[in-house]
Regions:
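ABC ATPase C-loop
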Residues: 146-147
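ABC ATPase NBD coupling module
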Residues: 59, 70-91, 124-127, 220-227
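The feature captures the beta-strand-to-loop junction immediately N-terminal to the Walker
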Residues: 40-42
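Conserved ABC transporter NBD signature motif
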Residues: 63-73, 82, 110-112, 117, ...
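Helical segment within the ABC ATPase nucleotide-binding domain
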Residues: 169-182
């Protein structure tokens, strides 16, 4: 559920890329607390670059990023402490440590038990080394660790990468719940269009670094041909 009138993350005319070469061009995106926005598009469309530029890992070549009403810091760690948190596609867990130790490293105060209540499957795995977890379990742990930082916005990159569909289907409702019950804004990069649109409020389809299509999730679900045209850069 989104909250009209409030904006927690705003990208204004963002152009960003690598070595001075733009991978994203003139992108506008505003995210409200409690809103889930899906970024869709083929490989190389600029989805991950958008997330990395939003959190400060990739520099903006033009335009701006505002977080909580202020220009976003260039220091990634400062952004994370303020609540702008990236969940990368490599899952960001320490494979040589147990689930319990991963949670302890990320925990703030007594938040661990509260967050583990959101991921009850992890409680039975607390003593297991993370390298022995399935991909779905590692991704669940990555989300739990992100929640332990007290995020205001989660930037989730390719959550389903390499995971069985059943694992993805189990985690998506948790992301929706984080938005609805905790007011966390979410930007979700996802290749599975139907799954992304099942939890998103809005979606943008990127093609060659530009927004080719935008609308509510309901609008896009009702017009799959429009999504297909946007994916391949075809005119209406």
């Amino acid at each position: 559920m989104s909250f009209p009138g409030e904006i927690i993350l705003e990208l204004r005319g963002l152009t960003a890329g690598y070595g001075g070469v733009a991978a994203v061009r003139d992108l506008d995106l505003a995210v409200a607390p409690g809103e889930v926005v899906a970024l869709l598009g083929p490989n190389g469309a600029g989805k991950t670059t958008t997330l990395l530029a939003a959190c400060g890992l990739v520099p903006a070549l033009a335009g701006s990023v505002h977080f909580a009403g202020q220009p976003r810091s260039r220091q990634v760690e400062r952004n994370a402490r303020a609540g702008l948190v990236l969940v990368p596609d490599n899952r960001g867990v320490f494979h040589s440590l147990s689930v319990r130790d991963n949670v302890r490293l990320a925990a703030r105060g007594g938040a661990a038990d509260e967050v583990l209540d959101l991921f009850p499957e992890l409680r039975r795995l607390l003593g297991r080394r993370c390298g022995l977890l399935s991909g779905g379990e590692q991704q669940m742990l990555a989300l739990a660790k992100a929640m332990l930082t007290g995020p205001r916005v989660l930037l989730i990159d390719e959550m389903s990468l390499g995971l069985a569909p059943i694992a993805v289907q189990r985690m998506l409702p948790t992301i929706r719940d984080l938005a609805d019950r905790r007011g966390v804004g979410v930007v979700l990069v996802e290749q599975h269009i139907g799954l992304a649109l099942s939890i998103a409020d809005r979606a943008l389809v990127l093609h060659h670094g530009r927004v080719a299509l935008t609308g509510t999730a309901a609008q896009l679900r009702g017009d799959p041909r429009a999504i297909e045209r946007a994916y391949f850069g075809l005119s209406a």
